[in-house]
Swiss-Prot record:
Region entry Oligomerization, spans: 323-354
Species: Marmota monax
Chain positions covered by the region annotation Interaction with AXIN1: 114-290
Protein name from the UniProt record: Cellular tumor antigen p53
One GO-annotated biological process of the protein: positive regulation of transcription by RNA polymerase II
Subcellular location: Cytoplasm; Nucleus; Nucleus, PML body; Endoplasmic reticulum
Stretch list, region Disordered: 65-87, 281-323, 348-391
Motif ([KR]-[STA]-K motif): 368-370
Residues recorded as bearing N6-lactoyllysine in the entry: 118, 137
Modified residues (Phosphoserine): 9, 15, 20, 33, 37, 46, 181, 267, 313, 390
Region (Interaction with WWOX): 64-108
Cross-link (Glycyl lysine isopeptide (Lys-Gly) (interchain with G-Cter in ubiquitin)): 289, 349, 355
Gene that specifies this protein: TP53
């Protein structure tokens, strides 16, 4: 009992009388400055402080705990000074070049010869440098080189819009075809161009330009062949809303080294449609019509231009007049006067033809002289009959 009473006489270290001393240990404005406030672990008493509390008394323990501890460098300043990550924009400011560059290896493209039948699924027009193909059909593209590129060379295919107002946009599939279950397990659903029959194809998205491309290793031609053939597929129609939306596109094929340096470049236009043969025939006819020279109207002319048929038709050449004279014996006065009038009409026509083009009517004196020579006696006078109901 004596030991228990002696224990009760000892003041507990964390009683209400010591709360004011603990409160004074807290820094000022602790609530309003969370950055400068120490962590919660520093506010709690450690095991050493508790032992000092019992051994040396509460006053000495509070003085030791109130001593400022060495502050560790806080990474708050470095965190605030770190720049925020840049925002990624959906459009690209750089446009890939579409100029032909054969390079030192003589890189060029080739296509199979095909007609314009309705049953054809892929056809190439040399005059337009344009490929017409159906959706998701095989499009063989031949790669020709004069000398073999070094090992590690790759072939990249990328689609861009042809017109300048659309070049900065990324060519991708429409939302409808993106949701279609036609993936081969390698190509992402938003990529337009795919490689058929090559498991080594890599589908890339550029981190800076966000453009889609497909890369395959370059393989030299097989024995007995002069070129390498890659089979491409176009997975969206040119007329799809939300995708190409009838905007013409170009496919750029580049030959790149193992370090990414450009070895060659070539391009061609592509139209993905339902009837490639019909569309190729129509566009070639329109191209030929546009290539024909059209006559230009004269300057400062307000009159309507004549059609091409009348302006382009060659005018007949004028035949030289015959200068010989012939004598014709005619029986009967009436016949003589009739042949005389016919001869005068022919003479008048020849006189008009000899004059300049600007003078379309003969001179009045010439008509008077011809009229005076006519001595026709069989002139009929026509009288107007007046009926009973006429006014």
């Amino acid at each position: 009992m004596e030991e228990a009473q002696s224990d009760l006489s000892i003041e507990p270290p964390l009683s209400q009388e010591t709360f004011s001393d603990l409160w004074n240990l807290l820094p000022e404005n602790n609530v309003l400055s969370p950055v400068l406030s120490p962590p919660m672990d520093d506010l709690l008493l450690s095991s050493e402080d508790v032992e000092n509390w019992f051994d040396k008394g509460p006053d000495e323990a509070l003085q030791m705990s109130a001593a400022p501890a060495p502050k560790a460098p806080t990474p708050a300043a470095s965190t605030l000074a770190a720049p925020s990550p840049a925002t990624s924009w959906p459009l690209s400011s750089s446009v890939p070049s579409q100029n032909t560059y054969p390079g030192v290896y003589g890189f060029r493209l080739g296509f199979l010869h095909s007609g314009t039948a309705k049953s054809v699924t892929c056809t190439y027009s040399p005059s337009l440098n344009k490929l017409f193909c159906q959706l998701a059909k095989t499009c063989p593209v031949q790669l020709w080189v004069d000398s073999t590129p070094p090992p590690g060379t790759r072939v990249r295919a990328m689609a861009i819009y042809k017109k300048s107002q659309h070049m900065t946009e990324v060519v991708r599939r429409c939302p409808h075809h993106e949701r279609c279950s036609d993936s081969d397990g390698l190509a992402p659903p938003q990529h337009l161009i795919r490689v058929e029959g090559n498991l080594r194809a890599e589908y890339l998205d550029d981190r800076n330009t966000f453009r889609h491309s497909v890369v395959v290793p370059y393989e030299p031609p097989e024995v007995g062949s002069e070129c390498t053939t890659i089979h491409y597929n176009y997975m969206c129609n040119s007329s799809c809303m939300g995708g190409m939306n009838r905007r013409p596109i170009l496919t750029i094929i580049t030959l790149e080294g193992s370090s990414g340096n450009l070895l060659g470049r070539n391009s061609f236009e592509v139209r993905v449609c339902a009837c490639p043969g019909r569309d190729r025939r129509t566009e070639e006819e329109n191209f030929r019509k546009r290539g024909e020279p059209c006559p230009e109207p004269p300057p400062r002319s307000t009159k309507r231009a004549l059609p091409n048929g009348t302006s382009s038709s060659p005018q007949p050449k004028k035949k030289p007049l015959d200068g010989e004279y012939f004598t014709l014996k005619i029986r009967g006065r009436a016949r003589f006067e009739m042949f005389q009038e016919l001869n005068e009409a022919l003479e008048l026509k020849d006189a008009q033809a000899e004059k300049e083009p600007g003078e379309s009517r003969p001179h009045p004196s010439y008509l008077k002289s011809k009229k005076g020579q006519s001595t026709s006696r069989h002139k009929k006078i026509i009288f107007k009959r007046e009926g009973p109901d006429s006014d």
